[in-house]
A protein has these predicted regions:
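Non-globular targeting/processing and membrane-anchoring segments
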Residues: 1-49, 70-79, 85, 92-103, ...
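Short glycine-rich or small-residue beta-strand-to-loop segments that form or flank ligand, phosphate
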Residues: 49-55
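Short, solvent-exposed coil/turn elements at secondary-structure transition points
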Residues: 56, 86-88
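Conserved redox-active cysteine motifs that mediate thiol-disulfide chemistry
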Residues: 56-63
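Short acidic/glycine-rich loop or secondary-structure boundary segments that cap or lie
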Residues: 60, 90-91
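Histidine-anchored nucleotide/phosphate-binding helix
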Residues: 65-69
């Protein structure tokens, strides 16, 4: 993932604006996410870039994505970009489950230099 391609992703606000499925559920879960002051301080102490690959119809994305989006809201040094799986095969194909499956959601965490530091790909059977 290059910095230039990462920058082409949607912000969470832009993602929410284009949602046709599950928008209300996403917003409810985001609002219901409870964060402690320790949670907020931990994320503010980091300089991260977070890549999310999803689709609005994906129920599995409703499990972790709203909470993560809420967590980074108040973190000025954390940048999250969202890519729709079906519209961005070049991005999706870099993060295939077991090198074969276009499983979503995908969350990839980078440091400020775009070095990958962590990755989560949905674990349900493909």
């Amino acid at each position: 993932m290059t910095p230039e391609r990462f920058a082409q992703g949607m912000t969470v606000a832009a993602y929410l604006a284009q949602m046709r499925s599950n928008k209300e559920r996403f917003e409810q879960r985001m609002a219901a996410t409870e964060l402690t002051s320790a949670d907020r301080e931990a994320i503010r102490a980091r300089k991260l870039k977070i890549l999310v690959i999803t689709e609005d119809w994906c129920g599995d994305a409703l499990v972790g994505f709203p909470g993560l989006a809420r967590l980074v809201e108040g973190a000025p040094d954390v940048e999250m970009r969202v890519f729709l799986r079906d519209a961005n095969p070049d991005v999706m194909d870099q993060y295939l489950k077991r090198g074969l499956y276009r499983t979503i959601p995908v969350f990839v965490f980078f440091d400020e230099h775009m070095n990958e530091v962590a990755r989560f790909i949905e674990s349900r059977p493909a």
